[in-house]
């Protein structure tokens, strides 16, 4: 008699539901490819536009209607956006998953794999009796921050006060108060409630997956495992694990691959790559200061100026005088194939907002960072990069200023400190690769044991 898993792949079927923000979407869909390559069939529940042609032919796709006010989605109120999306998603997701289980049987689905930002999805899956795996697309330290957030408010660390910005936070080393997770464009209480719901949902999960390296967050991962009593898995660097995954949400600006040809003409390690990711924004005067800082550094650069980078403007023409100053030395693109840029031998530094995906990609390619965090977890990421791992320099100041931009670039490219940073980053690159079994010496009859191996075993045990 045929098994109820017939047609579901040798290892069973996983329902994957990515969160519809680019920085969240890509890691989840990339890990889904890794699971698929290891014998698991994939059904993608999705709330945003994606093209099935970008994925393996045997993927299934199930739309889930999620609605929100376009004005809200265009805002920077992250807490309200995520809260609204979860509220809208709950009933449609339950209906879709229930229909799938009714049509194919409970045993047809091993588990639901989703983003912890979909706290409603984690909760609904558990309620329906399906094991749920949550992926943290930020650092493990960020989930530790979620868990401590109410305490931080009760002890007066938050909201951040000017006179306390430089104070250490003993509850969350190595942070200073100014490094604490926050979204200044959202209400603090609403943000705290969102994080509390996320932690509650994570506690009910059958496992938590982190796009991080055991090398850099071993203690934090152990702390989370102990506090939540949930298995934890560190699967970074996903860009090395599944290097060919290129699909993304529709609406993201097409990458300009011409910058790779320009990089081919530059000296090894000479170019600064500048990007603030898919969501971070800056005021017009900061854009001007950054432009002049890059010009004054005399450093070759590739700068990503996406359409919504500058608040109030749809495009970002270089300020008067800058274009002439940097002609032949720097190029500006609307979007870049970041992983390929960071892997290019001409790139010797990355001026970044320290979004977690960008931080992980920089480490995996051994590219030192100039850190310029903008919101959320990026401040804490910067503290680890600069003060704990010592693989980057901090761009000092709350507002971008051309002199500080130039100084931070000069520290990375023209000092003994910069050379030491580059040497440490080479070590991190090697260690990151070994974390997923690349460059590991093993017996010829064995495969290197990794957290991904353990994760697949867990899924197949459900």
Swiss-Prot record:
Any coiled-coil regions, as ranges: none
Active site: 24 (proton acceptor), 115 (charge relay)
Keywords of the record: Glycosyltransferase, Transferase
EC number in record: 2.4.1.202
Claim: Transferase is one of the keywords in the record: yes
The protein's enzyme class: transferase
Residue positions binding an anthocyanidin: 24, 376
Family that this chain belongs to: Belongs to the UDP-glycosyltransferase family.
Protein name: DIMBOA UDP-glucosyltransferase BX9
Protein source organism: Zea mays
